Design a protein with these regions (language model features):
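Cytosolic juxtamembrane amphipathic/interface segments immediately preceding
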Residues: 177-193
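Conserved Switch II/interswitch segment of TRAFAC-class P-loop GTPases
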Residues: 1-15, 19-41
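Alpha-helical transmembrane helix bundles of large polytopic membrane transport and channel proteins
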Residues: 26, 36-181
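Core alpha-helical transmembrane segments of integral membrane proteins
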Residues: 194-208
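Residue-level signature of catalytic and energy-coupling elements of molecular machines
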Residues: 18, 30, 47, 117, ...
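Short flexible coil/turn linkers enriched for glycine and charged/polar residues
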Residues: 21, 49, 185, 197-201
């Protein structure tokens, strides 16, 4: 999993999704030379411990760390090494996901149990059709999701998105210190702020 260290927040969002697949992973923290030049400080040990995966610093432009990252990835795949799932979700959302896991236990590969639970929480139609769940199980899932939506006054997909970003924000506070002056954003950061804005994102994509 290649992570752009200069846009780490956006990249970590995808990382949280990939971790739910239960696939052996090594993170290649790319463009680390640019991050250092910007004065950014990333505590790789803290980040690695929190995510449960090994992190290798790389610079594709300078050809640094790529071989080591590839070797680590090959070793992880060979040994089927997977870390524990990070605690991305909390409170009633985690409770609902755990309940969904109980409802579908035995129906899916245990490695992918959390991924399926999240997709069912989001009411992913393709996943629902794929699993061919009984009406009783579907009802139990819907009750768990609806209860969360009512408690949090939001829709299921937004709840998942918001909790991912809340988790990433905690990671950033604990393991990442930006070198730029407070309030100074890179071009990439500015673009991220706009395209991930819940109000502006849809009109922007509609125009594209």
């Amino acid at each position: 999993n290649i992570v752009d260290s200069t846009s780490i927040e956006r990249n970590l969002y995808l990382t949280t999704q990939l971790l739910e697949l239960g696939t052996p992973m090594v993170i290649a923290m790319n463009m680390i030379d640019v991050s250092r030049k910007n004065g950014d400080k990333i505590d790789m040990k803290k980040l690695s411990a929190a995510l449960g995966v090994e992190i290798v610093e790389t610079s594709a432009l300078k050809g640094e760390g790529s071989v080591k990252a590839a070797e680590k990835a090959a070793a992880a795949a060979k040994n089927r090494t997977t870390g524990e799932h990070p605690h991305v979700f909390t409170g009633s959302v985690e409770h609902a996901l755990a309940h969904i896991e109980d409802l579908i236990g035995g129906k899916v590969d245990p490695r992918f149990l959390r991924w399926y639970a999240v997709k069912l929480f989001e009411r992913d139609e393709k996943v629902v059709a794929e699993l061919k769940l009984s009406e009783d199980v579907k009802k139990g899932i819907e009750e768990a999701v609806s209860s969360c939506e009512k408690e949090m006054d939001d829709d299921a997909e937004s709840i998942i998105t918001n909790q991912r970003y809340a988790y990433i924000n905690t990671l950033m506070q604990n393991a990442v210190k930006k070198g730029k002056a407070k309030g100074s954003l890179s071009v990439s950061d500015k673009i991220d702020r706009v395209v991930t804005n819940r109000v502006l994102a849809l009109p922007i994509f509609a125009l594209i």
